[in-house]
Every structure is written in structure tokens, then in C-alpha cells.
């Protein structure tokens, strides 16, 4: 009797249901760790694989159920995490033997943040320089000239105080010199020495300087200076002695 295709598919499905999804070769590799694994049959390995699948399925369902209860109805879909497995082992006595295997992983409180640093693109610096250059080109020349004038005006006030101070000092020194020169005594008539001559130009310059000084002095100061000059003028004693000697001789002749 030939089997139909439907019967073949049903038979294959039964075989798949009876065989575990976990590979038998991996189960045997784990079983060989035990020195007595030589006496284990293939059917025992198959049964162990089925038991492992059922255990894993039950453990995962319990962990997801506990996570759903803790979160409530915030999220419809849940993802299996290590924390959910740890809570399941802690809350159920059936899985206490897994405490040494399933452990809570503590995350560092402060992360260094090095992984967050992102490298700059290669052309980013060049693009920024090109933007700055284009912005400078867009600025008209009139605005640039106004900026230069503003800079000059800002620097001028710093230079003005020094110039004003120098001018004030010069004015004060000139006024002091003019006052001191006005209070000088009248010079005595010095005898003329042969061979020493004074040019007319020097005399004219001195007269002009004296006139300028007299113009700068106030009228009241000028009157005071004239009185001082009169008091300081000393009479020539030689002339007085000659006059007195002439008078004595005339009186002697008359006698």
C-alpha cells in the first residue's frame, strides 16, 4: 500500500513532536562531563533534552508573569531580562537552586561618558571656515570703514589726557617765567669793554620779549612792578662825588 502525501506529513509531524528541539549532540557533550556517562543510553539523552525544554519554558513563563505583575498594564509586550529572572528565583522556592547561576548584575552609578564622545566629521572645520569667509565678504566696505572709525575714536580718549596735561604744564611754566622775569631788579650799567659788541638784532629781540611780557602782565601788576623798580634803582655815587668836589673848589676860589 502506498502512503499518500497527507499521511507522510502527519507521520513527520509526529516524529518532530517526539524529538526534542534541543540538539541531542549538545546534551551528550554536557553529559560526558560525568565519568559515568558511558552507561547512559540514547533514549535517556532524549528524555533529558525534553525535560530541559520543559524546565526552560516554565522558568521563562514564571519570570515574564512576575514582570507583568510589577509593571501593571503600562506595556503590552514584555522582554525577558536578567532582572526578571533574578526576581523569579528570589520569589519562588522551586528555583532556589539557581541562585548561584542567576545573579543580579549591578550597573555602575557613574559612567565615564567616553562612549558618548562622537568624532567630528572630516570636513566640518573646513565648512566653518568657508562660512566665516563668506560672511566677511557679504559685509559692505562702508560698514568696515565705520568700524575702523569707531576703533580710532575709542583709542583717542586714552591719548587726549596726556596731550592736555603736557599743554597745561607748558602754559604754567610760561606764566611762571613771565612773572619771575617781571620781578627782577634793574640791571646796573656795566662798563663797556673794548672789542665786545652787541648786534642790533639781539637788542631788538630783547625789546620784543620785554614788550610781550609787559602785555601779558595785568595793569595792576605792572604798576606794582614799576614802583619796585623805582625803589631798587641805585644812584651813581661817582657822579655825586664829582659834583660835590666841584662845589668845594668853587667855594674856595670865591674865598
Swiss-Prot record:
Q: Which GO terms describe its cellular component?
A: CHRAC
Compositionally biased region (Low complexity): 171-184
* Ranges annotated as biased composition (Acidic residues): 135-156, 199-219, 236-255
- Annotated region (Disordered), positions in chain: 109-255
Q: List this protein's GO terms for biological process.
A: DNA-templated DNA replication
Q: Which keywords does UniProt give here?
A: DNA replication, Nucleus
- Self-association and partners: Heterotetramer. Consists of four subunits: POL2, DPB2, DPB3 and DPB4.
| Further remarks about this protein from its record | In eukaryotes there are five DNA polymerases: alpha, beta, gamma, delta, and epsilon which are responsible for different reactions of DNA synthesis.
What is the recorded name of this protein?
DNA polymerase epsilon subunit C
Please give the organism.
Candida glabrata (strain ATCC 2001 / BCRC 20586 / JCM 3761 / NBRC 0622 / NRRL Y-65 / CBS 138) (Yeast)
Q: What is the lineage of its organism?
A: Eukaryota, Fungi, Dikarya, Ascomycota, Saccharomycotina
